[in-house]
Amino acid sequence: MEMYPRHRYSKHSVFKGFSDKVRKNDLDMNVVKELLSNGASLTIKDSSNKDPITVYFRRTIMNLEMIDERKYIVHSYLKNYKNFDYPFFRKLVLTNKHCLNNYYNISDSKYGTPLHILASNKKLITPNYMKLLVYNGNDINARGEDTQMRTPLHKYLCKFVYHNIEYGIRYYNEKIIDAFIELGADLTIPNDDGMIPVVYCIHSNAEYGYNNITNIKIIRKLLNLSRRASHNLFRDRVMHDYISNTYIDLECLDIIRSLDGFDINGYFEGRTPLHCAIQHNFTQIAKYLLDRGADIVVPNTLIIHQYIQ
């Protein structure tokens, strides 16, 4: 048997819920099924802001062999689990396939489908969990007004994971990105702000002022895979987004310049890429653009010559 800091059957074991030896003292599931069969609501909460099902899901140990079909039961588990139990989760998905494309909202909180919720949980999400949901009917590209038209991939890209808390370094898990692509994630779908995933990624990476270096490999991959996107959503704006969000990797700029029909002097929101570089005092980027045909005589209130030494 593998060695772990704590015995796998101990009171505080991280493996709790996976073994029959652990499960022998579980709660009586008949009580839970009786709650459900008598209409226990997933939205009516007690003074602690918990509904009956949430209270159950936050128990330390779980052993649900069968549960009545409910519209948001998978969503609720992903939101409220305490110790994640994969065998339990798998049974829950397989017996509630019909609800995997339902959108789960409570008050002002917009959660989306189970895959949206999973994509928001960077500590939990794995390719296998994603495949379980998608193979059983959860639309990989599900989106709706309830999720600000964001796909699960958008949801995954909207927050980072702290990899090194001491230095605040954040990163995307490339294996998760690859799993999205393998499962058919459409990289050309915009959210309600008109951002396809790569543009959303570019903005999200810069949102908190973090340097983009740790994620640049992912951005390069997404740039290359987004070539089929509508020109107005990608080709005609992405260099402006890239430079305006303080990115300096020249290989990404090369990828953008290689897009069919790309105009290095093209305008987006009234500015050319050169304007964006000058605004942020990126002399290296400005010289890169000038060396590749950027027009120094362009309409703008800035006197570009003052910034190019």
Swiss-Prot record:
SMART domains: ANK. PROSITE patterns: ANK_REP_REGION, ANK_REPEAT. InterPro entries: Ankyrin_rpt, Ankyrin_rpt-contain_sf, Multifunctional_regulatory. Keywords: ANK repeat, Repeat. ANK repeats lie at residues 13-44, 110-142, 160-189, 197-231, 269-298. It comes from the Viruses. The keyword Ligase does not apply. Corresponds to the C-terminal part of Kelch repeat and BTB domain-containing protein 2 in cowpoxvirus. PANTHER family: ANKYRIN REPEAT AND SOCS BOX PROTEIN 2, MYOTROPHIN. Belongs to the orthopoxviruses VACWR203 protein family. This is Ankyrin repeat protein VACWR203. The lineage of its organism: Viruses, Varidnaviria, Bamfordvirae, Nucleocytoviricota, Pokkesviricetes.
